[in-house]
Amino acid sequence: MSSSSQAMLQKSDSIAEKMPDALKQSRYHMKRCFASFVGGGKKLMKREHLMNEIEKCIEDSRERSKILEGLFGYILTCTQEAAVVPPFVALAARPNPGFWEYVKVNSGDLTVDEITATDYLKLKESVFDESWSKDENALEIDFGAIDFTSPRLSLSSSIGKGADYISKFISSKLGGKSDKLEPLLNYLLRLNHHGENLMINDDLNTVAKLQKSLMLAVIVVSTYSKHTPYETFAQRLKEMGFEKGWGDTAERVKETMIILSEVLEAPDNGKLDLLFSRLPTVFNVVIFSVHGYFGQQDVLGLPDTGGQVVYILDQVRALEEELLIRINQQGLGFKPQILVVTRLIPEARGTKCDQELEAIEGTKHSHILRVPFVTNKGVLRQWVSRFDIYPYLERFTQDATSKILQRLDCKPDLIIGNYTDGNLVASLMATKLGVTQGTIAHALEKTKYEDSDAKWKELDPKYHFSCQFTADLIAMNVTDFIITSTYQEIAGSKDRPGQYESHTAFTMPGLCRVVSGIDVFDPKFNIAAPGADQSVYFPYTEKDKRFTKFHPSIQELLYNEKDNAEHMGYLADREKPIIFSMARLDTVKNITGLVEWYGKDKRLREMANLVVVAGFFDMSKSNDREEKAEIKKMHDLIEKYKLKGKFRWIAAQTDRYRNSELYRCIADTKGVFVQPALYEAFGLTVIEAMNCGLPTFATNQGGPAEIIVDGVSGFHIDPNNGDESVTKIGDFFSKCRSDGLYWDNISKGGLKRIYECYTWKIYAEKLLKMGSLYGFWRQVNEDQKKAKKRYIEMLYNLQFKQLTKKVTIPEDKPLPLRLASLRNLLPKKTTNLGAGSKQKEVTETEKTKQKSKDGQEQHDVKVGEREVREGLLAADASERVKKVLESSEEKQKLEKMKIAYGQQHSQGASPVRNLFWSVVVCLYICYILKQRFFGANSAQEY
């Protein structure tokens, strides 16, 4: 589109005003196009579908280009989707991040009407459920209608800078007459720890008294040398109405008092930020991460368990470290406490997820607190998918709240939720206790599945999106602040809406119409990017810290010329620098795209080797269809471009200590890291590589575009333009050859960018500032939020709780039904061959044996035995299985086999013989079950 057309539109108040002019520019072709749009009847069309139809309708390429480069073409590029309900085509246009407009075009006469979000959603609903779209009593959710008193940002560029603007709003609110300072005074009077006043006491109950006492106190403190401990003059300050919390030394106390005095005299956001960073407001933090297996060892790769565990553990370490520094600077001897609250899972798969309390490594006062899911039948033992978790959350919140209060011996000062379930639990608890709350979505499921809102009925039996999207809306609107890693997460990019932005207006036909779900211009949104653990990911130049013990294995990993299960391909010229990439092997991560770019470019092949860490080599080892396709594509590319001797493919690596040293070894070769993803929400590997001093090329689609300053701290590449990207990488190596300092300059530029913006220390400082600042903002707006609070309570009780009743609560599978019969057939001298999980044996037989031989050691369950158990003793047949195995006839036969097996074992039978008897027992059980459940003929065939 021409720049003049874009400028013309930007001057207009709305797309609706310019749309008629755009259609008039080529009325004949426009009528043909819109007739084609409505030709197939009702449907939902995406931008690419509209473009395809235009290409079919306007055969003349010159005429088509003229239209697409004009005003209509620009409007089309702004359009995210179109609801087609003949004769109308309704467009949902997004000219800028966060800004949405809706227009309706009559395909017959090309008349244009501007419509509301509600009108657009009704047209969209009629594609999926026409009767519901016409229901005048259909439920509409409109948070905008009850949240109109809250200030809003106005520019797309302001999105995600909420705390900065909250400071400005507060300073504006406090400015003027002294009575406007009362909220700040009341906030200071409420500061306490375990009932002990901090900063000021009730003697300073007016602004005038506080201001006067501050002036006198500054004079008193000035008489002491700057390093004088607070305790030396604490009593003198107490007599003036001041309590501890101002600082640990005379210098610190004086600084804090002067800052407060200046805020009381003339509030400005800079001074307010400084004041709130010093106030003793946060000591005890609760972090919820409910689903999956949350632990410190042996959990990654288990269901619903991934990078979020590492994120939260690193977050906790950084928070505790920052809290300890602040508490010490405040002159307080308190010990901070951080609790990561998750689910206790009795069937823990060899992890510590069945352990209630676990100290977090690398911290002094932080723990994982696990609370079980409880139903009316008791504690739920097995893992539950994150999609099926909703019926348990209310009871979990109640039980967790009780445990937390008992553990902390007070209310927490800050509650942080993670993911939909953790955010909802955090919202329920924060509302009940009146505590400041923050939420972190990590990934909102709504944007992962196309049209998952409109097609929720199809997906609900499997994913329960009706529960999830409702829970997300509740948590987003309850929370005091929202933390995201990137701008893209909130408001996307020019072409793509953000994850939160997709909740602005959407519909779930037959359930509810959300005309205003969340406003991305709300100042509750904040960007606080995580860092990488700098004790693990540090520059390659720090020789004394490097993990040299990994060097032999890394040399083997990179240069051993023999293919094996861990690597294939080889590097003939070890003197060349290495182009390195590490990611999952899927389409979006685009690793095969990078290999193809490299294969096509002769210049780059001559200048550098290529090494990728991704997935498997053998398709049979993967259960993922997409990964299998990428594996095949990778092998094809290796053959097509004859990459042997230039390319090394390493299987996925999970040891982050060795991975960090691998980055540094690549830096030793003067290589680069390339992240070529088609889209990347954040880009943790980019942060890791830059931390290690490795010059980085990363996708311009998503978070990495924010991390890297192009040409200064790294380089942006376009994943959709391989030729341009590979040229950029090649030019870098050429410049490094001609300028010996260029590689070092980019390496140092990357490190500078990391230290300025992407460390866990910066993250912790931002988070604690938010906890203090939004805590005050929450108190100031308490009365205005009452209506919204009631609205949310109604949505939770009348909508969400009803939806959770449709989620099937699985039958608990206690050990007597699942394990007892099978395990009684096994000898007592069982060894653990699996993940190390221990299960309690609770059959009546075992209880009797335990009474006679008190303290008998519980038996570990082998992985193989667990698989047999899962295959044979399925939950829906467990009772019948039990009856079969306990029938007198079969029991006698099995007892004989068991005795024979035991005799063989006691006589020191060989492993082969032991294996033989194990197989016999298992096959006989299969035979019994087959005969009883599927008939004699089926059993004979078996």
From Swiss-Prot:
Segments crossing the lipid bilayer: none
Phenotypic consequence of gene deletion: No visible phenotype.
Main location: secreted
Broad class of enzyme this protein falls into: transferase
Any Pfam family: SUS_N
GO molecular function, one term: sucrose synthase activity
Alphabetical GO biological process terms: callose deposition in phloem sieve plate; sucrose metabolic process
Alphabetized UniProt keyword annotations: Cell wall, Glycosyltransferase, Secreted, Transferase
GO cellular component: extracellular region
SUPFAM superfamilies: UDP-Glycosyltransferase/glycogen phosphorylase (SSF53756)
Region entry Disordered, spans: 830-862
Expression sites by tissue: Detected in the whole plant but more precisely confined to the vasculature in cotyledons, leaves, petals, anthers and roots.
Subcellular location: Secreted, Cell wall
Extent of Basic and acidic residues compositional bias: 838-862
Catalytic activity, EC: 2.4.1.13
Reactions accelerated catalytically: an NDP-alpha-D-glucose + D-fructose = a ribonucleoside 5'-diphosphate + sucrose + H(+)
Activity dependence on pH, as recorded: Optimum pH is 6.0-7.0 for degradative reaction. Optimum pH is 7.0 for synthetic reaction. Optimum pH is 9.0-9.5 for synthetic reaction.
Function: Sucrose-cleaving enzyme that provides UDP-glucose and fructose for various metabolic pathways. Functions in callose synthesis at the site of phloem sieve elements.
Family: Belongs to the glycosyltransferase 1 family. Plant sucrose synthase subfamily.
NCBIfam families tied to this protein: sucr_synth
Protein name as it appears in the record: Sucrose synthase 6
Source organism: Arabidopsis thaliana
Designated gene of the protein: SUS6
